[in-house]
């Protein structure tokens, strides 16, 4: 009997694994505004959220790829923005150079993001300057224009990144 209990105990201890649940993070993000004007990314006039940056050599610089955050002209809240400022705050893997590689092998490469028609033209988005301002009236006309440019580091490989933005109208 003792032997049966001992064998049962050994068998149970071998099959009992860790019962610890997986941990994770949840991010909550929102904005409170009296006026809303939803924007959609557009690349070469086509709605989309993937910007193809092309291929660059190590330490090379890619072409500037233009894109805009634009609202449909028939969206109700956008019409009341003509005298306001739109502050766009970017978040993601921001460094002092730009957006860092998040999933590719070219880990010392980055994307330089600059305004085209912001209140400060050519303003770079980086960790110390993640908010850029635009005349809000541009939301339904030309949109809030940017360029994205891949800057190659020393390590060859693929580059993958993502960024989020939030718009506050003042």
Swiss-Prot record:
Positions of disulphide bridges: 37-78
Signal peptide span: 1-21
Gene Ontology annotations for the cellular component aspect, listed alphabetically: pilus
The entry's keywords: Disulfide bond, Fimbrium, Signal
Chief localisation class: other
Cellular location(s): Fimbrium
An annotated GO BP: cell adhesion
Summary of the function given for this chain in its UniProt record: Fimbriae (also called pili), polar filaments radiating from the surface of the bacterium to a length of 0.5-1.5 micrometers and numbering 100-300 per cell, enable bacteria to colonize the epithelium of specific host organs.
Family: Belongs to the fimbrial protein family.
Protein name in the entry: F107 fimbrial protein
The organism of origin for this protein: Escherichia coli
Gene encoding the protein: fedA
